[in-house]
Amino acid sequence: MASIQLSDVSFGYGEHVLFSGLSIEFARGKVTSIIGPNGCGKSSLLKLVSGICKPWEGTVRVLGHDVAALSSKGRARLLSLLAQEHAAPPMSVRQLVTCGRYPHHGMLAAMDAADYEAVERALAACGLSNLAERPAAELSGGQRQRAFIAMVLAQDTPVVLFDEPTSFLDVSACYDVMELMRSLKEEHGKTVVAVIHDIDLALRYSDEVCVMRDGKLLAQGTPQEAEVLAAVEDAFDVRVELLHGELGNSYALWRR
């Protein structure tokens, strides 16, 4: 069953048409990565799903709801989006994570016990309980990304969107973030859709992969499917060799 459905969507910027009749579905309760060359429409796709942008034609549905017909608070209760670029605000880690609860009661309403419990659970799940009172601006890149993921977890939406969550992170922090992203599905039952720029990370941590180029969906399926790997080679003009680890995960070796 699909959590997200785009049906015959057309969209662009100004006179530039990016998507023309695009249809795609994202499965419920899975981690799906969207990969493709720069400018192929990956981030714009997330903006359409999240309601930041509206399609020229076609419909975008999340859990059966037409996104264009929802209020901003209605969207925030269905899905959360961690954008690619976000500066650390002048507040503590705990205060940042608490922002995730605003869609449930508003900016000025008092938080109740359930809100505080959700914040503490999110801090613990992301390994930030001991950093809760530290200013978010003082965190390392990996810690800061975990803090934003904790905010998303506190928001407690059934659908979570990530736009290049590992950008500008070192290798160790990348793996930490991907493990956290995976845990949103495995431990919390979320549907996760992420734009990932690293082919290996996408194939290693995803249940399904969508390969895009020039605003079109080239292939969608599991990382092991031959059609998906062929589309990766076509989209990036590389050769891909898929290796299988002892725990069942996949590793991509690619070269020109």
Specify the residue positions occupied by each region the protein language model found.
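Catalytic Walker B motif of ABC-type/P-loop ATPase nucleotide-binding domains
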Residues: V160-E164
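Conserved ABC ATPase "signature" region
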Residues: T98, A113-L131
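Conserved ABC transporter NBD signature motif
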Residues: G58-A69, R75
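ABC ATPase nucleotide-binding domains
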Residues: A235-R256
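Helix-to-loop junction immediately C-terminal to a conserved catalytic motif
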Residues: S50
